[in-house]
């Protein structure tokens, strides 16, 4: 298998404030977390894991041949859960890059995962994350995050507000991160910062501490499921692609 020095970790906890037992919600006849895992698994990497605190989630994943790492339910963030899971991977000294894929994107494209891995390996960035060019209507929801970058594609700032102000086209941030191992270790050692807590965006902790985040363009905005309304959209999308035989 390719990229033997890369681990993909999908953090997934059962408790959710906005959508009860979110990972186990059905899209068609398949749970959200199973759909995420199956999409990610198409990237073809050996070291692909779901990190969870739930026996129910673990059961779903192991039944389809996936690998699970149990992490403490008290872990505060997805990135912290990713790091805790990484430390429990057998022979992890051979892993130099870790990709954190959020467990709420049931139609994430495997090509996007491979793209950030290649970009991370061929750059000097601490972290790499995907972005999509979108218009104003596509990002008006408060759960969406936009980013501004410099001429080289280095992230300058992320926000839940539309930035830059007054623009008609924006860069939508896709919730997936590729870390160098030492960058992930540094990130989790840092305390939450003012901007991170204000915007409720973990990646600002990295920027406030001088870490570099590179961005790479991908084509499609993946559906993220955070609310009941998001779930309805995901089900509708699934029904539409099923009719087309995709």
From Swiss-Prot:
Pfam families: CTP_transf_3 (PF02348). The keyword DNA-binding does not apply. GO terms for biological process: CMP-keto-3-deoxy-D-manno-octulosonic acid biosynthetic process; lipopolysaccharide biosynthetic process. Keywords: Cytoplasm, Lipopolysaccharide biosynthesis, Nucleotidyltransferase, Transferase. Its EC number is 2.7.7.38. GO terms for cellular component: cytosol. It is found in: Cytoplasm. Gene3D superfamilies: Spore Coat Polysaccharide Biosynthesis Protein SpsA, Chain A. Its main location: cytoplasm. Disulfide bonds: none annotated. SUPFAM superfamilies: Nucleotide-diphospho-sugar transferases (SSF53448). The keyword Lipoprotein does not apply. CDD domains: CMP-KDO-Synthetase (cd02517). InterPro entries: Cytidylyl_trans, KdsB, Nucleotide-diphossugar_trans. One of its GO terms (molecular function) is 3-deoxy-manno-octulosonate cytidylyltransferase activity. It catalyses: 3-deoxy-alpha-D-manno-oct-2-ulosonate + CTP = CMP-3-deoxy-beta-D-manno-octulosonate + diphosphate. Pathway: Nucleotide-sugar biosynthesis; CMP-3-deoxy-D-manno-octulosonate biosynthesis; CMP-3-deoxy-D-manno-octulosonate from 3-deoxy-D-manno-octulosonate and CTP: step 1/1; Bacterial outer membrane biogenesis; lipopolysaccharide biosynthesis. Belongs to the KdsB family. Activates KDO (a required 8-carbon sugar) for incorporation into bacterial lipopolysaccharide in Gram-negative bacteria. NCBIfam families: kdsB, PRK05450.1-1, PRK05450.1-5. This is 3-deoxy-manno-octulosonate cytidylyltransferase. It comes from Rickettsia rickettsii (strain Iowa). The lineage of its organism: Bacteria, Pseudomonadati, Pseudomonadota, Alphaproteobacteria, Rickettsiales. The gene is kdsB.
């Amino acid at each position: 298998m390719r990229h033997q020095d890369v681990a993909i970790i999908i953090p997934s906890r059962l408790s959710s404030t906005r959508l009860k037992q979110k990972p186990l919600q059905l899209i068609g006849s398949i749970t959200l977390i199973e759909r995420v895992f199956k999409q990610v698994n198409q990237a073809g990497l050996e070291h692909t894991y779901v990190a969870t605190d739930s026996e129910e989630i673990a059961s779903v994943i192991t039944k389809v041949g996936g690998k699970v790492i149990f992490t403490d339910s008290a872990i505060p963030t997805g990135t912290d859960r990713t790091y805790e899971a990484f430390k429990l991977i057998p022979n992890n000294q051979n892993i130099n890059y870790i990709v954190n894929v959020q467990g709420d994107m049931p139609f994430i494209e495997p090509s996007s995962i491979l793209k950030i891995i290649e970009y991370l390996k061929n750059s000097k960035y601490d972290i790499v994350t995907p972005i999509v060019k979108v218009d104003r209507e596509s990002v008006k929801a408060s759960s969406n995050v936009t980013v501004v970058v410099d001429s080289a594609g280095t992230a300058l700032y992320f926000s839940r507000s539309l930035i830059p102000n007054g623009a008609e086209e924006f860069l939508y941030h896709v919730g997936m991160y590729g870390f160098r191992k030492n960058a992930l270790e540094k990130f989790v050692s840092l305390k939450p910062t003012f901007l991170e807590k204000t915007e409720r965006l973990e990646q600002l902790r990295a920027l406030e501490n001088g870490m570099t985040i590179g961005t790479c363009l991908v084509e499609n905005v993946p559906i993220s499921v955070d609310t009941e309304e998001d779930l309805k959209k995901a089900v509708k999308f699934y029904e539409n692609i099923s009719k087309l035989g995709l």
